């Protein structure tokens, strides 16, 4: 069988749906196939509906600090970017965001920030405990980068039942091209496995179309995710930021991101898979197309409008000026237009 013909590709899709894996060359052929693959999109949608129906889960995003000690070459809030106006939200600010979100039906809050030394383990745990005490029916997700296993356990015990930490790329040489020398893929992976060991729901993920990325790198990402078996996988296109070393690199494409969303859904039928803001940034209907390709989570922004423009990981980020209620109503319309419906429960992973 020639895997690069329409019939060969069709067979790969059928086999991937059944076996949840392919060989490395077969994955590469599927990723690189130049034509649209409606059969792949349809298979991914059928699989997501078989597990989650037409439900799309809301995650209220609270970007609580744009201060970061790291200097990742792709990121707009890297410590080396001296043009950024830095901010931190207080515990009361964060609780106010949660109040707004709860009234709008959000039952998961995602606290995301740079690796800001001010937010010590104790300080973060106090914030988590306040949220958990006020909203015991909600799930808290934390995303604050690489910490020790003891820190992760403390966060988990304080109420953060989920943790997001994108691995960004599963290839050492590629990782080294994207990050400062003091950072390592080995440590990033070790953090992810530590999170699993303590019982946290874990999210990993990667950029699509990042500088120097090859198809082989993407296949390695799929293999690593199979090893990790996360509860959530966040992928989105690389989008350049003007004040980074990667300002002149081309952005990742909608085409390849959607292709990978569908592949991920077939590999991981149970996974929680966001249609990211970055998708909506590179295409006006990016998030709707992401849902149709297999995604089942959206993450509207609950951060104060005055700080949103300061949390610019990449250029032209959407939804910078909308009040939380506007974001909620807009997303509800978008989700419905794609043929799904927003649900307001905590949206736990459904493993079979």
PLM regions with names:
Residues 79-95, 101-122, 128-192, 201-208, ...:
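Core AdoMet radical
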Residues 119-144, 184-201, 249-271, 323-335:
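Alpha-helix-loop-beta-strand connector modules within alpha/beta enzyme cores
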Residues 148-155, 211-225, 281-292:
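Catalytic cores of alpha/beta
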């Amino acid at each position: 069988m020639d895997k690069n013909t329409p019939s060969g590709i069709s067979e790969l899709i059928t086999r991937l749906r059944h076996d949840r894996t392919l060989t490395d060359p077969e994955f590469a052929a599927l990723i690189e196939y130049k034509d649209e693959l409606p059969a792949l999109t349809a298979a991914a949608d059928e699989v997501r509906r078989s597990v989650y129906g037409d439900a799309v889960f809301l995650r209220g995003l609270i970007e609580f600090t744009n201060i970061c000690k790291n200097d990742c070459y792709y990121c707009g809030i890297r410590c080396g970017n001296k043009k950024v106006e830095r901010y931190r939200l207080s515990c009361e600010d964060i609780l106010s965001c949660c109040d707004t979100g709860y009234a709008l039906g959000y039952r998961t809050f995602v606290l995301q920030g740079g690796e800001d030394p001010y937010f010590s383990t104790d300080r973060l745990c106090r914030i988590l405990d306040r949220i958990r005490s006020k909203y015991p029916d909600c799930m808290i997700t934390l995303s604050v980068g690489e910490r020790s296993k003891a820190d992760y356990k403390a966060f988990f015990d304080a109420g953060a039942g989920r943790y997001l930490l994108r691995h960004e790329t599963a290839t050492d040489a590629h990782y080294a091209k994207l990050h400062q020398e003091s950072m390592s893929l080995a440590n990033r992976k070790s953090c992810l496995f530590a999170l699993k060991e303590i019982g946290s729901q874990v999210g990993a993920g990667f950029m699509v179309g990042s500088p120097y990325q090859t198809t082989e790198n993407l296949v390695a990402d799929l293999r690593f995710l199979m090893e990790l078996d996360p509860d959530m996988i966040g992928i989105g296109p690389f989008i350049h930021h003007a004040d980074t070393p990667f300002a002149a690199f081309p952005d990742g494409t909608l085409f390849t991101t959607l292709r990978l969303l569908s592949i991920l859904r077939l590999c991981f039928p149970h996974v929680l898979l966001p249609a990211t803001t970055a998708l909506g940034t590179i295409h006006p209907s990016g998030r709707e197309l992401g849902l149709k390709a297999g995604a089942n989570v959206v993450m509207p922004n609950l951060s104060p409008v005055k700080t949103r423009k300061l949390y610019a990981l990449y250029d032209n980020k959407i939804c910078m000026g909308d009040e939380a209620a506007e974001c909620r109503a807009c997303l509800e319309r978008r989700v419905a237009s794609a043929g799904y419906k927003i649900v307001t429960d905590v949206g736990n992973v459904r493993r079979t």
